[in-house]
Regions:
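Beta-propeller fold detector
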Residues: 24-32, 85-88, 123-132, 226-229, ...
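Predominantly five- to eight-bladed beta-propeller fold
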Residues: 22-23, 61-66, 70-73, 127-155, ...
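Serine-hydrolase catalytic core recognition
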Residues: 247, 378-519
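Short loop/turn segments that connect beta-strands within beta-propeller blades
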Residues: 19-21, 78-82, 118-121, 219-223, ...
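Conserved beta-propeller blade repeats
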Residues: 1-7, 35-56, 74, 90-108, ...
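Beta-propeller domains
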Residues: 6-33
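N-terminal targeting or regulatory segments adjacent to alpha/beta-hydrolase or S9 domains
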Residues: 162, 167, 326, 337-423
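Structural motif
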Residues: 11-16, 66-73, 110-116, 174-179, ...
Length: 519
């Protein structure tokens, strides 16, 4: 809880830093000085630390599949003896997961689940055998679940490290879609340089059949596989499976097809029986973020819900008893950081100052709410595991991202990144000033917007206007944050058009996020 780790800029090391000072404490991993078989690796793409901190999974050779999914070649690094070996030699892996005791790793390869036992010379065994492309997927979501429920993993260990539980997706009845593949870049596909190829996969369009989903468990000692008896509509969803600290309970989330009725079950992996502990019903629809932002710590379930029209937090016990409403008001909780299991304090971010700003808060177990960030703009946080420190990431409409170290008590201890060089470079260009504004429609609805005027703007003159609009649900384009390049890929088209004499305007209309369900 007193330190954090980062990959070095050259991707060769993993370095540990002090949360208190921001200074380097130790080099935990150095690719050029590890022991073991000679391995040629370009660099570290990511890493996963075991619960006991003794083992680190080193992620390399990452290849994207869809928006969030990827395969990679993982290596097991033993921190104590500085030795690294491959997790598996049979092909790239997906979504590896450590067992709570740190002695095993489960992963997915080609739609099947595998298990590696570190105490048995990294012996690898196959857990499922029915996985097949475009038919059966074990432990990782299909395309539509990954895209719409914002997840790339559907597999957990039980708290005693004796069972693996996962969601199985049967997409055999889902209709196929084919899209052309071209040479492209990052990486280039030379086989499509002259003629395009085809990628055919299961793609459920609106109103069509989705995958049939079920939940399973595997007993590591007896090798017995069991189907969990989770109640589900014929066309229902299982958007998430989550571990708890009780080995006899795995949390399974279900949604009806209309997505206005969420149920959370506690399922026993041995008996296969499911007990309903929480239901949440809303007038409109339950956002996918409500499922993924639910936190389960100790005996607590922290549930985001729009049941009163705004996204707020509700604290339950594992048995489904509502302990307290954590937040309330005509604003939205935007990020959920977690619960301090020792105190019951809840850490989150919300736009309590208005839809364009975001601040970080802690809701104490005694009912008192304390604001942890104070600069206007967009604030987010990365907390230490003991909730004594946090990294504050801040920007506003005219200032790029700044990273600072802070204590939960309110003291800033270090500036990690100030981006002064970027701000100086940007100031050299003749750019228009970006400003926020608001107006009220003929229906009495206040809308927020931003505007970029040409440099040397003369209020007495008339200017042509370009309107940029997205308007997607849950999305906000109008924020008090640093953001240049509305079209992505580094194209600062809004400033270019301002240089050509246009006024560029964006307005968040009805249906966009941050302002409650009715809006």
């Amino acid at each position: 809880g007193e330190t954090y780790m980062q990959i070095s800029p050259d991707k060769r090391k993993i370095v540990k830093y002090s949360f208190k000072t921001g200074k380097e404490v130790a080099t935990v991993f150095d690719l050029d000085n590890v022991r073991g078989p000679k391995i040629r690796i370009d660099g570290v793409d990511g890493y996963i630390v075991s619960p006991d901190g003794r083992t680190i999974l080193i992620q390399t050779g990452t290849q994207s599949i869809y928006r969030r999914s990827f395969t990679a070649e993982y290596y097991i690094f033993d921190v104590r003896n500085n030795k690294m070996v491959a997790l598996s030699l049979a092909g790239p892996q997906q979504t590896p997961v450590f067992s709570p005791d740190g002695t095993m790793i489960a992963f997915v390869r080609e739609n099947n689940i595998y298990l590696v036992k570190l105490l048995y010379d990294n012996a690898e065994s196959q857990v499922t055998k029915d996985g097949k492309f475009n038919e059966i997927i074990n432990g990782v979501p299909d395309w539509v679940y990954e895209e719409e429920f914002m997840t790339n993993s559907s597999m957990v260990f039980t708290a005693d490290s004796k069972q693996i539980c996962w969601i199985k997706y049967d997409e055999s009845k889902v209709k196929q879609y084919s899209m052309q593949l071209f040479r492209g870049s990052h990486p280039e596909k030379d086989e499509y340089a002259t003629y395009p190829g085809l990628y055919t996969y299961k793609y459920p369009k609106a109103g069509e059949d989705n995958s049939k989903v079920t939940v399973w468990s595997y007993d590591i000692k007896s090798h017995q596989t069991r189907k969990m008896e989770v109640p589900l509509d014929a066309d229902g969803y299982i958007p998430r499976i989550a571990a708890t600290e009780d080995a006899s309970k795995v949390a399974v989330f279900t949604l009806n097809r209309h997505q206005d009725h969420l149920s959370i079950y506690m399922v026993n992996p041995l008996s296969t029986l499911a007990k309903l502990v929480i239901t949440d019903k809303v007038d409109k629809y339950i956002k996918e973020t409500a499922v993924q932002d639910t936190r389960i710590v100790g005996n607590y379930i922290l549930l985001p819900s729009e049941r009163d029209g705004f996204n707020h937090l509700y604290l339950y016990t594992l048995t489904g008893q509502l302990k307290r409403r954590v937040t309330t008001g005509q604003y939205e909780v935007l990020d959920v950081y977690g619960i301090d299991g020792a105190t019951g304090d809840v850490y989150y971010a919300a736009n309590a100052d208005g839809a364009t700003d975001k601040q970080v808060f802690v809701a104490r177990a005694n009912g008192k709410t304390v604001r942890l960030t104070h600069k206007a703009g967009q604030n987010s946080a990365i907390f230490s595991s003991n909730y004594k420190y946090f990294i504050n990431v801040w920007s506003d409409i005219n200032n790029p991202l700044t990273y600072t170290l802070n204590t939960v008590g309110g003291k800033q201890t270090a500036v990690l990144i100030d981006n002064k060089e970027l701000k100086g470079k940007w100031a050299k260009y003749e750019t228009g000033t970006k400003e926020l504004f608001a107006f009220t429609t003929s229906e009495g609805v206040k809308l927020n917007g931003w505007m970029i005027k040409p440099a040397g703007f003369d209020a007495k003159k008339r200017y042509p206007v370009i309107m940029y609009q997205y308007g997607g649900p849950g999305n906000q384009q109008v924020l008090n944050s640093w953001n240049i390049g509305i079209k992505g890929q580094g194209a600062v088209i809004e400033q270019y058009m301002a240089q050509q004499g246009y006024v560029v305007v964006c307005v968040d209309g009805r249906g966009t996020g941050g302002r409650g369900a009715n809006f």
